[in-house]
């Protein structure tokens, strides 16, 4: 397949989004799953400190101390003095058990991150290959996780090993040469650094297609590497075209991230990355390699105009969201209870620090700019909703954890706010939309956890695939709600109450 044809095929697939994008919505779910591991580690450490009365000693030692850190523009000495005043009170926390829990949590988070990323990659590439064969992408994705997970993991391990050996060898060679001194050290550095960089880039270029070869050819690591090298040798122009396209995508997103970091709205880059750039690039490289192997027959692009499809999709998303709320009231009740329980926990846990630490909604709104704030709120809140929902696929635990943590944060802010009435006035207009959306997203995560468990026990991949498609449309509907909430939060909530308070 020629690069132009691969690009057209990718765009055609993306115009029917519900059979490929759901697995790319798993990208923000990865961080939610890892955060759940970290939250569990923190909970274990806190329970240990409570059971051994160390937590009580810490709270007693902190009583009466200045817990509010100096402002960011304060001299460095002020931070040093503040840290020195706090450190003795935290000494009961420094125990071997807490250290062991911290190390175990970090290791568990790394392992879980690697496992989830590999599983998500297998699902994404399987969905791409399935759609490019004009088959059901979600069904291919669900089946592909178990089929290709191990091989893709080994591919990633091999690539990391090559990078590690190359970097260590280059650093050791340069260090020895520089210790020898003179022009020899400089010459060796000039030669070794570019050579090592070339090896790293070559490895990345090969392994970019190797994971695709695992899925398209249904082979192990060795055959996938050989297939990739053959593809690059036979189709160098196609491979280079993909590398250029990928570089443009990465550089473009990076430049946009820098720009939006300055003017505001940086979370938009995250949404653009997982909702368009990543699936587009994966579809292109899968089309190129699959075309080389003769395994793809891309679907035709729909005849309907893009604007009409977009409007129809938004309406369908709203309908699916309403339907989901109506057919799962028990899950929404449970999700609301978890969120409320988190709020109570946050309020209670912040009690000992309420007099020493304060937050201010007025301070947070001091530099408020409505347009960029609206974009930031919409993109960030929807990304959180997507992550919490699809993170629920891991037995619903990450979805419940996300609800609990959000509740805790809300409770802490409410307890430590300097002007509670002002905070309530600010939250009320957009909160009547945003908080129910959070509950629906959490309920969707709980639902997907149950479906995933039943699918695994009953070996029913089609049922899970269908629920993933439906979840995609529910999240589209939640996106509409959260955009409206963001507009209210950006343009109404910070201003309407000021004449009255």
Give a label for each model feature:
Residues 241-250, 392, 429-448:
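Alpha-helical transmembrane segments of helical membrane proteins, especially in multi-pass transport
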Residues 28, 435-485:
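C-terminal transmembrane helix pair
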Residues 105-128, 205-209, 384-408, 440-451:
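Transmembrane alpha-helical segments in integral membrane proteins
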Residues 1-351:
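Hydrophobic alpha-helical membrane segments
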Residues 84-112, 374-394, 398, 408-415:
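Individual transmembrane alpha-helix segments
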Residues 171-195, 257-269, 356-364, 413-427, ...:
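Membrane-interfacial helix-loop-helix connectors in multipass membrane proteins
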Residues 346-405:
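Transmembrane helical segments that form the transport core of multi-pass membrane transport proteins
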Residues 485-501:
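Juxtamembrane boundary at the C-terminal end of a transmembrane helix
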């Amino acid at each position: 397949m020629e690069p132009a044809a691969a690009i057209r095929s990718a765009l055609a697939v993306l115009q029917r989004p519900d059979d490929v994008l759901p697995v790319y919505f798993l990208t923000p779910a990865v961080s939610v799953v890892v955060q759940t591991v970290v939250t569990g580690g923190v909970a274990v450490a806190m329970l240990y400190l409570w059971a051994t009365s160390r937590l009580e000693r810490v709270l007693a030692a902190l009583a009466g101390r200045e817990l509010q850190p100096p402002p960011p523009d304060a001299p460095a000495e002020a931070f040093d003095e503040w840290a020195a005043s706090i450190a003795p009170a935290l000494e009961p926390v420094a125990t071997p058990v807490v250290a062991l829990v911290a190390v175990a949590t970090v290791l568990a988070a790394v392992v879980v991150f690697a496992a989830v990323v590999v599983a998500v990659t297998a699902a994404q590439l399987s969905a791409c290959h399935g759609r490019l064969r004009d088959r059901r992408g979600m069904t291919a994705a669900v089946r592909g996780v178990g089929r290709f997970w191990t091989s893709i993991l080994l591919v990633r391990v091999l690539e990391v090993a090559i990078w590690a050996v190359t970097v260590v060898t280059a650093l050791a060679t340069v260090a020895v040469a520089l210790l020898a001194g003179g022009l020899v050290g400089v010459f060796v550095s000039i030669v070794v650094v570019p050579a090592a960089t070339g090896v790293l880039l070559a490895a990345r270029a090969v392994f970019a297609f190797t994971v695709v070869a695992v899925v398209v050819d249904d082979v192990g690591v060795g055959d996938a590497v050989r297939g990739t090298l053959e593809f690059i040798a036979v189709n160098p122009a196609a491979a280079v075209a993909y590398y250029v396209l990928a570089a443009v995508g990465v550089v473009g997103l990076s430049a946009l991230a820098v720009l939006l970091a300055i003017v505001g709205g940086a979370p938009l880059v995250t949404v653009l990355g997982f909702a368009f750039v990543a699936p587009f690039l994966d579809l292109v490289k899968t089309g190129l390699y699959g075309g080389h192997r003769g395994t793809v027959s891309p679907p035709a692009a729909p005849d309907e105009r893009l604007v009409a499809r977009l409007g129809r999709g938004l309406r369908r998303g709203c309908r699916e969201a309403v339907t989901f709320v109506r057919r799962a009231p028990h899950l929404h009740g449970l999700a609301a209870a978890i969120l409320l329980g988190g709020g109570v926990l946050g309020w209670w846990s912040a009690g000992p620090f309420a007099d020493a630490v304060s937050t201010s909604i007025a301070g947070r709104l001091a530099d408020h700019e409505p347009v960029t704030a609206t974009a930031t709120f919409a993109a960030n809140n929807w990304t959180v909703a997507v992550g919490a929902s699809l993170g629920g696929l891991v037995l619903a635990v990450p979805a419940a954890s996300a609800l609990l943590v959000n509740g805790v944060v809300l409770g802490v802010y409410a307890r430590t706010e300097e002007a509670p009435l002002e905070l309530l006035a600010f939250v009320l207009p957009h909160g009547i939309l945003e908080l129910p959306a959070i509950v629906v997203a959490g309920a969707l995560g709980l639902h997907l956890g149950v479906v995933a468990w039943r699918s695994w026990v009953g070996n029913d991949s089609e049922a899970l695939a269908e629920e993933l498609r439906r979840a995609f449309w529910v999240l589209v509907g939640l996106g509409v709600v959260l955009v409206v909430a963001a507009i209210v939060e950006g343009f109404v909530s910070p201003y309407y109450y000021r004449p009255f308070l």
